[in-house]
Every structure is written in structure tokens, then in C-alpha cells.
Amino acid sequence: MNKLLCCALVFLDISIKWTTQETFPPKYLHYDPESSRQLMCDKCPPGTFLKQPCTARRKTVCAPCPDHYYTDTWHTSDECLYCSPVCKELQYVKQECSRTHNRVCECEEGRYLELEFCLKHRSCPPGFGVLHPGTPERNTVCKRCPDGFFSNETSSKAPCRKHTNCSAFGLLLTQKGNATHDNICSGSSESSTHKCGIDMTLCEEAFFRFAVPTKLTPNWLSVLVDNLPGTKVNAESIERIKQRHNSREQTFQLLKLWKHQNKDQDMVKKIIQDIDLCENSVRRHIGHLNLTFEQLLKLMESLPGKKVTTEDVEKTVKTCKSSEQLLKLLSLWRIKNGDQDTRKGLLHALKHLKTYHFPKTVIQSLKKTIRFLHSFTMYRLYRKLFLEMIGNQVQSLKISCL
């Protein structure tokens, strides 16, 4: 009896494996009335419907689905499925209807589908951070910030951030943070000014880039070196600049080094004074923005080339005043991307920020800054300080290169 039972189980196992074994094209059992036999017919592929089942003399006949109809699997149906109608309010077409798939609708950025409605993602209040960001299918999941972490903003994307380690910045803990506030460190304003040093401001970069001719002659850099007043940049430094940077970037790097070597000269002090006036204008455009940590991070991600890291953004937020944070991060980006032009980088970022639903006031302020850095005001400053300073010889050379 046991032997018979074992044989039956083995036979059943073999039968199951045979019937479930994958074949291509997939098959199905069909009774053929002509031959009075059960036949293994081919199923119809996606994008078609079953027009005629197979017979002993003919294979399965499939026909294409008509417009606005589809099938998305191998099947045995004699009709196609009708595509879903147009998308609902606050949805967009993620995938259009075709013969092989249905129309796919999805809620707009920042919303998720609940029953038949696209609802706005939940924003986590101060003291709570995002555990799971919202998707088109589910709402944001918030979690109370644990000990040692905080969130001081209402956001649908920002997680809890770790309290500042004051000692890591050489500061003393004045007031311990909680779920809604960061630690407060003593001497933060004085130390921030020092630690938030910006390698080169936007105005300095724009000013020095105006000195780069549209078309460069082979001896442009040599003529510039010979005509710059004050302490000359040595040959070793010039050679290093030539090896590390492309031809257009070389002029910018040379002027940056020359300015550093002659910072005590009256002519350079005059340049710095006028550039400071320019910086005041830039700060009027972007110094008041008070971007959140999340917004600063998204802006850095939108810039081309090598990225400023999350750790860099965190450190900048903790050591720089709010009016200096964006300028500092742009300076860090430029350092990471040696030959990149910050103004062009911002132009690239603006195209992407629009898709992230970035605040319009921020985008408008960035646009104004970009226009200002490439305006006649900057060119006039360049002519006043640079061309007059290095003389008519270099001016003639630059004009002949334009």
C-alpha cells in the first residue's frame, strides 16, 4: 500500500512539473471538434487577440488589437481590453496607451493617489523628520526625531538632522538642542566668519572671467603676465597653471594668483573695494533667501559636474550665517569643478530646479544674480579696473581677439 502511494505521489509530481514547465510560445489545452482531440495550442502574444484557435492542421491565429485596445500578457482571449480613459485631475500620463499596455496615470510631483483623488503629501512638522518620502502611490511617513537629532522646519522631504557637535568645530556647547532645535555653540558668529571663508566670490570670478578673450592667441597668457603690475607670478606657478587647466581657465587662475600675491598693493585694494560693492548687489539678490537645508541640498544636486556632498552642506549650514550659506556652497562647487564657470553652472541648475517645484522667489532671485554677473555693470567695472590698470597694449590684444 505504501509502495503504491509513493508511486502515485511521484507520478503526480512529474505531471505537475510537466504541466507547469515553461515553453515558448506558451501553450494551452484546446478541444478540437474536427479531430475530437485535446490539442496544445499556442497562446496569443501581448498586443493581439485570439482570432482562431489551432486545429490539427493549423496553428493558432492571432490578430492585432485595434486602436485604444490592448493586451499585456500571453493569453487565450478572443478580445482585447479597452484602455483606461484620460487621466484624472492632478494626474499626468506616465505611459500612453498602446497595443501592449494600458494607459498609466500618475499623480503629479508632491501628491499621491488615495482612492480616486491625488492628495498632497503630508509635511512633517518641526520635531518630526521624514522616515519614508512620499511617492505617487503612498503618503509621506513621519517619525519623531530621536535623542540627538532635530528638525526645525515643516517639510515633506527633510529627515531629522543630527545635533551639531560643537567640539568638532572648536566651540563650546552653550545650550543643548532638542527635537526642534539644534545645539547652540558659543562663539558661533565669530568662528563662523572665520570658518566660512569663501575662496572666491561670485563677483571676483565674473570680473576675472571678463579678462578672458573670446578667441585666445597662443601668447595671450605671456602678454598678460608681462603687463600685470606689482609682484610677478613666477614661472613655476605659470607652468603649473598651464598643466592643470584648459586655455580659457588659465587666465582666470593666473589673475586669482596675482591678486593673492598683491593683496597689499593699492591697485588690488581698489579692485577689492569695487568688488565688495558688487558683492553687496549680489547679496541683495540672494542673501535674504534663507534657504532650508533641503533646498540647499537640492540646488547643489542640480549643479553639473562633481557634487557638493551632503556633509559639506551640513557643515556650511552649521558654520555660516544664512546670508552666506549659498555663496559658500557655490564656492565649494567651483573648487570641486576646477574649470567650470559658476554662472553657467547656475544656468544649468535653473533648468532642473523648475521640475522640483522650487520656490519661484528663489528662482527669480537666482536669475537676477546671473543676469547681473553678466551685465554691462560688470563689463564697466572690468574696463575701469582691469584695462586701465594693465595698459593699452593688452587692451588692443584682447580687442583684436574678440
Swiss-Prot record:
Task: Report which residue ranges the record marks as coiled coil.
Answer: none
Q: Name one GO cellular component term.
A: extracellular matrix
InterPro entries per record? DEATH-like_dom_sf, Death_dom, TNFR/NGFR_Cys_rich_reg, TNFR_11, TNFR_11B, TNFRSF_decoy_receptor
Q: Which UniProt keywords apply?
A: Apoptosis, Disulfide bond, Glycoprotein, Receptor, Repeat, Secreted, Signal
Please report the PTM annotation for this entry: N-glycosylated. Contains sialic acid residues.
Q: Where is this site: Involved in dimerization?
A: 401
Signal sequence: where? Answer: 1-21
Print the organism lineage.
Answer: Eukaryota, Metazoa, Chordata, Craniata, Vertebrata
Glycosylated residues, chain numbering: 165, 178
Q: Name one GO molecular function term.
A: heparan sulfate binding
User: How is this protein named in the record?
Assistant: Tumor necrosis factor receptor superfamily member 11B
Would the keyword Ribonucleoprotein turn up in this protein's UniProt record? Answer: no
List this protein's GO terms for biological process: apoptotic process; extracellular matrix organization; negative regulation of odontogenesis of dentin-containing tooth; negative regulation of osteoclast differentiation; negative regulation of tumor necrosis factor-mediated signaling pathway; signal transduction
